[in-house]
């Protein structure tokens, strides 16, 4: 019994030693090297880091960034604490000099109908403000967003702008860079729709200079002066400009003083020079006009008897040219003068109308010739004066018969008229011409016009051999088409030569 009790006590003692002994030993044992510890490691009591290590650790963690940020905030708060952004720098002492530079992101499109163009720019303005000077290791301070509104900014506005858009995504696209010597660089991005007076007299071979003028709105030349920064206009050539019908040819500038009721203001102006690409106008207007004019000459090769065909060709060409002339002015400003394109279309219209007029004259002359030959008169000299009384009665009867015959053009009327009948009807005999002469009051306008035309036009084959045509120009009516086949193309060719030489050299 006793041995069992001793054995149980021994086991209890050993178990107690196993639980307590190892825990005490682990506390005094240093941590293993391969164990990961998060956070600062515990240091043995009584051991301190050197002062140098403490300074470096603080400098690389919190003290150095907080120190710079604090100094920048102190500088900004100091210079803006007593700063009044409503007053310009050097007020009452000297004018503020503002240096200007422009960077062009894109130019165009140019609208000839609205007389305006669009331009996207980054506008730089530089001036000195003694109130913003500071003495520190910081060379510059950059302000953006709403903080810029706490500074004095030149009240520059664009004089010929219709609409101006500033960008505010993701923040307002403006920035102010303050140097330690008080120099301020203000940058803003904007898109401007500006007026551009286009003089379309040489259209479509025209060139234009679109201005962009700016000045101060409230400060005259005694308070604010604008200067070019060596006239630097940077252009982003890699960007695709939306000029469409124009080519950019260059830029120049001008500085002027404009007098207003409130003072004299300095105005700075950029001029963007562009020239038109007239390839589109050539295919849209010039080629159709030329082709229509040449197609109207087809009527010269159509027979005179085909009046309907020749009339349809002439009328169609005239109406087509009228349509082209109207269409060329569709997307065009309502100017009161003729452009180079209008002049070209007008000449083509005149040539087409002359083609139709040539057919009209030819048809009129040949028709009157046939009508006059259809009713010939045979004149008989009087043999006895006693026949006058008898012939007068017959003359009245024949006059009524002739009136009825003229109403029926198909009837061939052959009249025998004596000298007495001519005297009764008012005709006078001319021994030189051997034919009756018609007094002015008894002949209609058509007869007078016909007589005038007979002085220059030969309406009967072989008429140039007659005595009454001697010494006058003889033009054969039936040869008018032959003359026109040569005259019209030559005229149109020389017109094109003169037109393009003058227009391309303007």
From Swiss-Prot:
Q: What is this protein called?
A: Gamma-aminobutyric acid receptor subunit epsilon
Q: Subunit arrangement?
A: Heteropentamer, formed by a combination of alpha (GABRA1-6), beta (GABRB1-3), gamma (GABRG1-3), delta (GABRD), epsilon (GABRE), rho (GABRR1-3), pi (GABRP) and theta (GABRQ) chains, each subunit exhibiting distinct physiological and pharmacological properties.
For this record, an example GO cellular component is: postsynaptic membrane
The record's disulfide annotation reads 196-210
Q: Which domain of life is it from?
A: Eukaryota
Quote the record's domain comment: GABAARs subunits share a common topological structure: a peptide sequence made up of a long extracellular N-terminal, four transmembrane domains, intracellular or cytoplasmic domain located between the third and the fourth transmembrane domains.
Which residues are tagged as glycosylated in the record? Answer: 135, 253
Gene3D superfamilies, per the entry = Neurotransmitter-gated ion-channel ligand-binding domain (2.70.170.10), Neurotransmitter-gated ion-channel transmembrane domain (1.20.58.390)
One Pfam family, short name: Neur_chan_LBD
User: Where is this chain's protein located in or outside the cell?
Assistant: Cell membrane; Postsynaptic cell membrane
Give the residue spans that cross the bilayer.
278-298, 309-328, 345-365, 486-506
Q: Could you tell me the gene encoding this protein?
A: Gabre
Signal peptide span: 1-17
The source organism is Rattus norvegicus (Rat)
* Glycoprotein listed as a keyword: yes
A Gene Ontology biological process term: chloride transmembrane transport
Q: Per the record, which residues fall in region Disordered?
A: 32-65
Q: Outline which residue ranges sit on the Extracellular face.
A: 18-277, 329-344
Please give, as recorded in its UniProt entry, the membrane topology of this protein.
Multi-pass membrane protein
Q: Which PANTHER family match?
A: NEUROTRANSMITTER GATED ION CHANNEL (PTHR18945)
Alphabetic keyword roster: Cell membrane, Chloride, Chloride channel, Disulfide bond, Glycoprotein, Ion channel, Ion transport, Membrane, Postsynaptic cell membrane, Signal, Synapse, Transmembrane, Transmembrane helix, Transport
**Could you say which tissues express the protein in this record?**
Expressed in brain and heart. Strongly expressed in locus ceruleus from the first postnatal day. Weakly expressed in other brainstem nuclei and in the hypothalamus. Found in the cerebral cortex of pups.
Give the function comment from the record.
Epsilon subunit of the heteropentameric ligand-gated chloride channel gated by gamma-aminobutyric acid (GABA), a major inhibitory neurotransmitter in the brain. GABA-gated chloride channels, also named GABA(A) receptors (GABAAR), consist of five subunits arranged around a central pore and contain GABA active binding site(s) located at the alpha and beta subunit interfaces. When activated by GABA, GABAARs selectively allow the flow of chloride anions across the cell membrane down their electrochemical gradient.
- Membrane listed as a keyword: yes
Segments on the Cytoplasmic face: 299-308, 366-485
Q: In Gene Ontology terms, what is one molecular function of this protein?
A: transmitter-gated monoatomic ion channel activity involved in regulation of postsynaptic membrane potential
Q: InterPro entries of this UniProt entry?
A: GABAA/Glycine_rcpt, GABAAe_rcpt, Neur_chan_lig-bd, Neur_chan_lig-bd_sf, Neur_channel, Neuro-gated_channel_TM_sf, Neuro_actylchol_rec, Neurotrans-gated_channel_TM
């Amino acid at each position: 019994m006793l041995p069992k009790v001793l054995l149980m006590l021994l086991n209890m003692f050993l178990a107690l030693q196993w639980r307590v002994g190892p825990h005490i030993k682990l506390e005094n044992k240093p941590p293993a090297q391969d164990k990961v510890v998060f956070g600062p490691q515990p240091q043995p009591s009584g051991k301190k880091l050197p002062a140098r290590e403490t300074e470096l650790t603080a400098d690389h963690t919190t003290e150095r960034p907080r120190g710079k940020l604090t100094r920048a905030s102190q500088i900004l708060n100091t210079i803006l604490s007593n700063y009044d952004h409503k007053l310009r720098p050097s007020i009452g002492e000297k004018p503020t000099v503002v240096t200007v530079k422009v960077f062009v992101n894109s130019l165009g499109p140019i609208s000839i109908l609205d007389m305006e163009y669009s331009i996207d720019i980054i506008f730089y303005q530089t001036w000195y403000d003694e109130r913003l000077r500071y003495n520190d290791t910081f060379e510059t301070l950059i302000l953006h967003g709403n903080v810029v509104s706490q500074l004095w900014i030149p009240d520059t506005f664009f004089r010929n702008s219709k609409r101006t858009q500033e960008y505010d995504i993701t923040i307002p696209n403006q920035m102010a860079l303050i140097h330690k010597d008080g120099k301020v660089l203000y940058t803003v991005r904007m898109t401007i729709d500006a007026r551009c007076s286009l003089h379309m007299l040489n259209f479509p071979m025209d060139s234009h200079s679109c201005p962009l003028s700016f000045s101060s709105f409230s400060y005259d030349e005694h308070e604010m002066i604008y200067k070019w920064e060596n006239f630097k206009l940077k252009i982003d050539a890699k960007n695709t400009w939306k000029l469409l019908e124009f080519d950019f040819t260059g830029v120049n500038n001008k500085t002027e003083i404009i007098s207003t009721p409130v003072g004299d203001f300095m105005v700075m102006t950029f001029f963007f020079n562009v020239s038109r690409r007239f390839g589109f106008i050539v295919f849209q207007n010039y080629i159709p006009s030329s082709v229509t004019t040449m197609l109207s000459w087809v009527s010269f090769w159509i027979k005179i008897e085909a009046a309907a065909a020749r009339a349809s060709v002439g009328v169609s060409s005239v109406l087509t040219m009228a349509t082209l002339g109207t269409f060329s002015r569709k997307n065009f400003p309502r100017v009161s003068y003729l452009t180079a394109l209008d002049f070209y279309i007008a000449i083509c219209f005149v040539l087409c109308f002359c083609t139709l007029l040539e057919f009209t004259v030819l048809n009129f002359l040949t028709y009157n010739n046939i009508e006059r030959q259809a009713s010939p008169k045979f004149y008989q000299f009087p043999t006895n004066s006693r026949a006058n009384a008898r012939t007068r009665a017959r003359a009245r009867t024949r006059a009524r018969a002739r009136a009825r015959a003229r109403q029926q053009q198909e009837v061939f009327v052959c009249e025998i008229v004596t000298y007495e009948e001519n005297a009764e009807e008012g005709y006078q005999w001319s021994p030189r011409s051997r034919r009756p002469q018609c007094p002015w009051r008894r002949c209609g306008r058509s007869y007078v016009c016909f007589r005038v035309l007979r002085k220059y036009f030969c309406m009967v084959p072989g008429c140039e051999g007659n005595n009454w045509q001697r010494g006058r120009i003889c033009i054969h009516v039936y040869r008018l088409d032959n003359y026109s086949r040569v005259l019209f193309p030559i005229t149109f060719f020389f017109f094109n030569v003169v037109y393009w030489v003058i227009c391309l050299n303007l």
